[in-house]
């Protein structure tokens, strides 16, 4: 085990999920840990109890840290980069590490890292399943909320033996404080406006791009065709500089310049191309699977499968396990999750849809008529893009709730869409959507917004949606055996 933190004094700032894991792991590694949180102790009583159970004495309520005694400060991703406690540490020449930087420094197993605005969790879980199917002991960690299958990255790094693999979902906030972080394989799935309340567009792009910062020339940097072919790619390069690593690409069409490292799809199938040593099978037609064999709905999930497949291939996984998972994986909770069928109406929970790009892809994934429940706190970008998605994607009716409901409604009416209702609670929204839906329709929770105005988090929002649907008599928890949601 890495000894960098042994007998060192380390302040851990932010006592939520990742900060508590840092306290636990760094204490186990022999560090003298000082837990710190700016909130009063009474507001974080459970966290205080957890660190005290480790034998640690927390500093809370904005009390001062003694920077002179610190060897390191490890910050949680929820702490803003401009927070005084971090900037004071920088001014005092205390090394500030993000949780993923600390995790990388103690990790014995290789890390395969994924970032992007949307699709990170689904891709991470897909990749994890591909590695497991290949017989590799796999840990999934980072900025991921997917039931019981994931953990903070520092805990995964601590637990994983050298022969294992760690799949890491990485946010832009986590990438703000890296210096030596160098994953074995890194992927950037997509970039669209998000977190405008905390980062400018330029800051957001620069943070995402840092996932490739320390890769060497022969190490895989996996990028979507969406990024490579758009105007923004040139802007990204202007902001952050070109990628030094070996670019692998994935997307809609085959690209000759990536003829030995490209994954693509067409209307019939998914294809995966690699160097001959990677791809000894079917060299003339590198078919991964037919599209009809894929269980996940939506073109965005086709791209998630391709990204995970490329990462697995780059890591040395044979095609068999990759194909097995590509054709059997049924999804992740709160991501286009089938809930029930009531009176011929399907209910789909996509509570993780928290921005405009995810909203558009959610609607595109379900071409049937649908009643959409949306709203919350819009995180940035042009709200008119939500209206455009509604107008062109067979939305029978829109039920809005939350802080940004007036703005979304105004944008939709300006675009000529009028079938809109307002709800004060999610339960009321489900009731209204049910009344508006017809047999064969889908009621889709796709908020396009953050949840904190009405819910604890997006998981709480999704759970409440499922609970509301579950109260209807005759709700079937099993999806139908035929059609788009068969075997899901």
Name what the model sees in each region:
Residues 1-98, 102, 297, 483-487:
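N-terminal leader/targeting and accessory segments in enzymes
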Residues 66-68, 77-244, 467-488:
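Phosphate-binding loop of NTP-binding sites
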Residues 57, 63-66, 159-196, 233-291, ...:
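Extended acidic/charged loop-beta regions that coordinate divalent cations
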Residues 26, 73, 114, 143, ...:
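Residue-level signal for inorganic ion chemistry
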Residues 48-52, 384-441, 480-488:
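C-terminal helical cap/extension that packs against the catalytic core
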């Amino acid at each position: 085990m890495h000894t960098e933190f042994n007998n060192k004094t380390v302040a851990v700032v932010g006592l939520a999920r990742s900060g508590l894991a840092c306290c636990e792991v760094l204490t186990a590694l022999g560090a003298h840990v000082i837990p710190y949180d700016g909130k009063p102790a009474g507001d974080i009583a459970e966290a205080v109890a957890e660190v005290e159970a480790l034998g640690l004495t927390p500093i809370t309520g904005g009390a001062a840290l003694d920077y002179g005694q610190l060897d390191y400060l490890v910050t949680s991703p929820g702490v803003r980069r401009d927070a005084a406690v971090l900037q004071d540490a920088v001014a005092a020449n205390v090394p500030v590490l993000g949780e993923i930087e600390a995790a990388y420094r103690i990790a014995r197993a290789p890390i395969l890292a994924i970032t992007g605005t949307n699709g990170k969790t689904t891709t991470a879980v897909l990749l994890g399943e591909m590695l497991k199917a290949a017989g590799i002991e796999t840990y999934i960690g980072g900025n991921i909320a997917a039931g019981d299958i994931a953990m903070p990255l520092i805990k995964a790094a601590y637990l994983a033996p050298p022969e294992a693999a760690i799949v890491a979902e990485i946010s832009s906030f986590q990438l703000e404080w890296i210096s030596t972080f160098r994953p074995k394989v890194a992927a950037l799935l997509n970039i669209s406006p998000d977190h405008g309340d905390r980062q400018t567009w330029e800051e957001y792009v620069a943070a995402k791009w840092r996932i490739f910062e320390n890769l060497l020339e022969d190490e895989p940097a996996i990028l979507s065709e969406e990024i490579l072919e758009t105007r923004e790619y040139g802007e990204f390069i202007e902001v952050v500089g070109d990628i030094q690593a070996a670019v692998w690409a994935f997307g809609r069409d085959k690209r000759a310049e990536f003829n030995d490292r490209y994954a693509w799809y067409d209307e019939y199938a998914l294809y995966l191309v690699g160097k001959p040593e990677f791809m000894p099978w079917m060299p003339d037609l590198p078919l991964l699977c037919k599209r009809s064999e894929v269980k996940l709905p939506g073109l965005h999930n086709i791209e998630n499968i391709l990204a995970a497949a490329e990462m697995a291939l780059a890591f040395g996984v044979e095609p068999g396990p990759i194909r097995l998972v590509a054709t059997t994986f049924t999804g992740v909770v709160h991501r286009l999750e089938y809930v029930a069928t009531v009176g011929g109406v399907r209910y789909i929970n996509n509570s993780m849809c928290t921005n405009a790009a995810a909203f558009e892809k959610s609607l595109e994934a379900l071409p049937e008529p649908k009643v959409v429940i949306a709203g919350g706190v819009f995180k940035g970008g042009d709200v008119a893009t939500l209206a455009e998605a509604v107008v062109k994607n067979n939305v029978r009716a829109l039920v809005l709730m939350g802080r940004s409901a007036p703005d979304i409604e105004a944008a939709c009416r300006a675009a000529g869409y009028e079938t809109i209702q307002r709800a004060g609670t999610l339960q009321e929204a489900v009731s209204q959507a049910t009344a508006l839906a017809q047999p064969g329709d889908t009621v889709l929770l796709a908020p396009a917004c953050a949840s904190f105005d009405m819910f604890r988090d997006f998981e709480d929002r999704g759970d409440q949606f499922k609970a509301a649907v579950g109260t209807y008599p005759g709700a079937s928890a099993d999806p139908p055996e035929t059609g788009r949601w068969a075997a899901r």
